[in-house]
Amino acid sequence: MEAWYKVATPRKEVRQGRSFNPDEFAIHLEQVIAGTAPEDYREPEKFFSRTCFTRALREHAGMVLRRLSGETVNTAPVMTLITQFGGGKTHTLAALYHLATNGEKAAEYSGVAELLAEAGIKTVPAARVAAFVGNAWDPQDGRETPWIDVARQLAGNEGVRELGDMAKTTAPGTEALTRVFKAADRPVLLLFDEVLNFLNRHRSMADQFHAFIQNLTVATTGTTQGTAVISLPRSQVEMTDWDMQWQ
């Protein structure tokens, strides 16, 4: 039997005896999108070269790609990722982000060709992606509410106009959200992470945010090329009593 180091080459950090920074093991979706995450998470080629396509990741990514391709069988308009702390929720969202924003080019990345074959589609559809990361999000000029932020990411100023005049205080209805999807003029992928963290920090917005998510679910169901993926914790360590009631 060959020595293990001849069969599996250790990563460069191990070979060099470099001390590990625990922060490097935590992925933050907002940093991936902003381009400030560590290179292994920020660069899609490196990200996929070091990603293990588990059954859960293959299933979720396959369903999302099929939906963005216009398929309605073996897929879903809204998906929830519910795992224990450290179970890979944000890693899955980052994988979906890299796939959707790179489109056809993503087929060149490690493991993606096999993913496409398993999903029964030929290419990765390029999509408009909007991400909401609850532990990073706070109101700012131009994104006074989560739905304004999402609309702006999908369709710029036109998307915000489609929400109507009440968007700064009131969650949009399904018709307004459908107009935003049409203004995006591409398949639409919506990623939600750390939602409960946001609600804990902005409890005055909880009712309106809940209405937004409900209406978004209905609007997404009404399109054949749009999907929303929402991560939620399973572990009580990550939730307060109020979180569990809201969830």
Report each predicted region and the residues it spans.
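Flexible phosphate/Mg2+-sensing switch loops adjacent to catalytic phosphate-binding sites
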Residues: 75-78, 97-133, 160-171
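ATP-binding Walker
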Residues: 87-88, 106
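Walker A/P-loop-proximal flanking segment of P-loop NTPase domains
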Residues: 1-87, 94, 99-100, 247
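Conserved phosphate-binding/catalytic loops and adjacent sensor/switch elements of nucleotide-binding enzymes
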Residues: 92, 136-151
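Substrate-gripping "pore-loop 1 plus following alpha2 helix"
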Residues: 173, 203-215, 242-246
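Conserved P-loop NTPase "ATPase switch" module shared by AAA+ and STAND
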Residues: 133, 180-206
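Conserved P-loop NTPase catalytic core
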Residues: 118-119, 125-140, 218-222, 227-247
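Substrate-engagement module of ASCE P-loop NTPases
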Residues: 176-181, 209-229
